[in-house]
């Protein structure tokens, strides 16, 4: 039998080479070489290429993954990583780090900044720290993410220019590119070494824009962009342009369209009639979808709508597949913003009145504030004013529509506008927060975009405030003691703050926001794994979660204060609650006491005094994002974000990266994992999120889960969902992200015979990675 090598040379098939290779990829693992070989024999044919042999071996190993044999996921990952080594270097042994940087810089794949800011001696020293063997710790799901998404490559020719450990060290170097201006070169190298260690050992999670781009000539690294549309053609056009540009840079978009006037509203005193917000939003949607997220996938948007908008009955169902294409926005997701007043109306079963934004400017402004009593007074005035047009909707119909669309599509999100501002770190009178981002974890001020002519450059720019957020995560499953957070957070906050100064901004509105607030969003991954390791679940973890999260918050805030001491606070810090010494834990909801009594483990008065004296470098610091993708490359893989697992083995990934994913330490912790479809309701999860939100200055991508089997006749009562809404609001959650429905999923688990199927994540959930290039990480 003939085998065709990569260079076209034809050689005789040699089973001994296969056996030697299998011996290597199975070394130290509970995996059978003979089983892999026997399976792959069926896939090997005369004239097969070496690439296809590797693919046959990989597929064979992956097919053997089961609850009793999870190590085959690592075997499959090793096979793919071995293949990538040869594709990148032409040989199994990597080239020297210095030669790789020089070659890739010459080819234009790496930025010249690496060689300009580090000496050859420094690069050679860092080469001694690189552990290439760590590439063989990735499971197949993580290895595929590297192959398709993270490695610097020519996507046209299929040429690879690096392997994961090279990527990690380059990223670490880029994080501290100019650190020698603040520290000695020796101290800078220490920071780089720590960053590489945390990255390569899976302690850090960093987002796709960082991991895929930070070493290339492209200087755009923000995961999240939040944009606000004003009620004018100029503003809509400015948002259209901004959406298009940021989609090409790989950022997920959250676009606030809640201020657009309603359908049939008068324009220019009745000279024209408005066609409604839908068509303007569709234009923005098409602009973003026409662009690729940095070469990985089409742009993605969540549109954010006002819950009292006169077109609410339409906007709530824009995602509904039953709507005609011309009258829908099925390729985007939608968030409906409500407040405590609306929830009160629903509870009292009173009509809810909807308004046209231009007619009720004061009501609209008060909606995005914590001033509920003033809002209620203005609402009642508007209802009583016969000159103001309004639409009365029975509250039962209002909530049934909202709940039906949330359950039916899984992708109608909910936000609480009053809590968003009440529990923020910003002065809401000067910098209100109107909406969130693509994945509902960002809570930053924005302002209407408008075109502005810059006489110095003789070009038009976009004025207003575009909120950007750079993310980073810490894998709690890889941390044995919460005191470790202090060093981990110090290095990560330094790294991302450096990046805020290094990245370029296509619009002045974004550059201004960055200068004002320098926002960062540190999150959590591996939470479900952490619970399992500690023999906890989502119903009994509150005390330990509170202690760890308080430590996490303390470490992150201290790191930002230290940065403020060294580099100065962000420009807008005096317009934040930080300047008053008010911390996130100080503005917690009273109802949290029913979950766990508040206990302060640290001297928070010291923090308050230091904040008032030195300020903070970053006005926002913590945001808990989904981390769906990056969790798979944390060592051999960990659980994503703060989410529960849906099965012990799942099929996860985007269109090109679907692979079997096993939970960490499956055999040892098999009976400890809290499987979401065993839950009767979301109450324990909501309480867990509430404890985390207590210390989170931004928001949390909090999902809910609906299992129809828990209800009679498989019908989910609206009251069940409403009660969870009330619970989430009472405990201080700011947003609700996906609603995951079990009835659209196959949640079969693997058993020992390796024959049953893995859980196939529902289209809604599998698109989660496809649509969220940014904060899925």
Each predicted region: which residue ranges?
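Core nucleic-acid recognition elements
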Residues: 9, 31-173, 186-196
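Short acidic, low-complexity intrinsically disordered linear motifs used
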Residues: 763-777
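Alpha-helix capping and helix-loop boundary segments enriched in small/acidic/polar residues
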Residues: 6-13, 159-162, 183-190, 210-216, ...
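Conserved catalytic alpha/beta cores of large enzymes that bind or transform nucleotide phosphates
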Residues: 272-282, 289-396, 400, 404, ...
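Terminal amphipathic helices with adjacent charged low-complexity linkers/tails
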Residues: 72-104, 338-339, 420-443, 448-450, ...
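Internal maturation/activation junctions in enzymes
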Residues: 216, 489-511, 536-627, 700-701
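Function-dense linear segments that define catalytic or interfacial modules
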Residues: 152, 166-188, 192-269, 273, ...
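Catalytic alpha/beta core of large soluble enzyme barrels
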Residues: 122-146, 439-452, 496, 500-501, ...
């Amino acid at each position: 039998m003939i085998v065709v090598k990569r260079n076209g040379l034809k050689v005789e098939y040699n089973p001994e080479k296969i056996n030697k290779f299998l011996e290597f990829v199975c070394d130290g693992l509970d995996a059978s070489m003979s089983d892999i070989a026997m399976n792959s024999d069926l896939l090997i044919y005369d004239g097969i290429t070496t690439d296809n042999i590797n693919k046959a071996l990989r597929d064979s190993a992956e097919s053997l993954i089961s609850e009793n044999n999870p190590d085959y996921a690592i075997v499959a990952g090793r096979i793919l990583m071995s293949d990538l080594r040869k594709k990148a270097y032409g040989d199994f042994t990597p080239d020297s780090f210095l030669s790789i940087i020089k070659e890739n810089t010459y080819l234009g794949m790496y930025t010249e900044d690496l060689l300009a800011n580090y000496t050859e001696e420094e690069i050679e020293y860092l080469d001694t720290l690189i552990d290439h063997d760590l590439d063989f710790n990735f499971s197949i799901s993580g290895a595929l993410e590297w192959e398709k998404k993270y490695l610097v490559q020519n996507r046209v020719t299929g040429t690879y220019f690096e392997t994961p450990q090279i990527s990690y060290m380059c990223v670490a170097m880029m994080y501290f590119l100019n650190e020698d201006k603040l520290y000695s070169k020796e101290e800078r190298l220490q920071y780089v070494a720590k960053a590489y260690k945390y990255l390569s050992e899976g302690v850090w999670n960093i987002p796709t824009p960082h991991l895929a781009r930070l070493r290339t000539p492209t200087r755009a690294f923000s995961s999240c962009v939040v944009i606000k549309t004003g009620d004018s053609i100029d503003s809509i056009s400015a948002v259209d342009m901004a959406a298009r540009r940021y989609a090409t840079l790989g950022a997920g978009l959250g676009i606030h369209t809640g201020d657009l006037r309603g359908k049939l509203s008068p324009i220019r005193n009745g000279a024209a009639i408005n066609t409604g917000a839908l068509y303007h939003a569709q234009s923005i949607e098409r602009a973003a979808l026409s662009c690729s997220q940095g070469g990985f996938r089409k742009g993605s948007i969540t549109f954010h709508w006002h819950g009292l908008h006169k077109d609410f009955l339409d906007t709530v169902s824009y995602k509904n597949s039953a709507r005609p294409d011309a009258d829908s926005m099925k390729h985007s997701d939608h968030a409906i913003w409500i407040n405590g007043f609306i929830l009160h109306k629903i509870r009292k079963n009173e009509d809810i009145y909807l308004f046209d934004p231009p007619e009720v400017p004061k009501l609209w402004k008060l909606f995005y504030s914590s001033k509920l009593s003033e809002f209620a007074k203005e609402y009642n005035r508007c209802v009583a004013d016969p000159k103001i047009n309004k639409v009365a909707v029975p509250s039962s119909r209002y909530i049934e529509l909202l709940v039906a669309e949330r359950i039916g599509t899984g992708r109608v999100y909910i936000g609480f506008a009053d809590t968003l501002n009440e529990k923020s770190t910003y002065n809401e009178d000067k910098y209100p927060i109107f909406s969130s981002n693509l994945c509902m974890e960002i809570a930053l001020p924005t302002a209407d975009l408008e075109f502005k002519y810059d006489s110095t450059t003789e070009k038009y720019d976009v004025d207003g405030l575009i909120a950007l957020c750079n993310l980073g995560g810490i894998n709690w499953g890889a941390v044995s003691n919460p005191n470790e957070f202090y060093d981990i957070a110090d290095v990560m906050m330094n790294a991302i703050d450096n990046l805020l100064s290094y990245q370029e901004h296509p619009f002045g509105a974004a550059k201004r926001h960055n200068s004002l607030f320098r926002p960062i969003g540190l999150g959590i991954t591996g939470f479900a794994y952490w619970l399992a390791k500690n023999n906890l679940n989502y119903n009994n973890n509150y005390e330990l979660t509170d202690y760890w999260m308080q430590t996490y918050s303390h470490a992150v805030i201290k790191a930002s204060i230290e940065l403020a001491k060294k580099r100065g606070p962000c420009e807008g810090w005096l317009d934040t609650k930080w300047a008053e010494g008010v911390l996130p834990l100080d503005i917690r909801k009273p109802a949290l006491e029913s979950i766990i009594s508040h206990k302060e483990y640290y001297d928070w008065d010291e923090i308050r005094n230091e904040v008032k004296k030195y300020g903070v470098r970053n006005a926002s610091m913590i945001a808990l994002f989904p981390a769906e993708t990056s969790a798979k490359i944390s060592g051999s893989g960990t659980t994503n974000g703060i989410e529960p697992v849906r099965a012990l083995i799942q099929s996860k990934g985007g269109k090109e990266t679907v692979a079997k994913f096993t939970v960490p330490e499956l055999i040892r912790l098999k009976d400890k994992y809290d499987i979401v479809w065993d839950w009767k309701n979301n109450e324990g999860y909501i309480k867990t999120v509430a404890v985390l939100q207590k210390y989170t200055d931004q928001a949390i991508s909090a999902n809910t889960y609906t299992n129809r089997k828990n209800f009679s006749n498989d019908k989910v009562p609206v009251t069940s969902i409403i009660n969870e809404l009330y619970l989430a609001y009472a405990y201080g959650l700011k947003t609700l992200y996906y609603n995951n429905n079990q009835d659209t999923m196959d949640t079969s688990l693997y058993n020992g015979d390796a024959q049953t199927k893995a859980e196939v994540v529902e289209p809604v959930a599998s698109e989660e990675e496809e649509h969220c290039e940014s904060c899925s990480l």
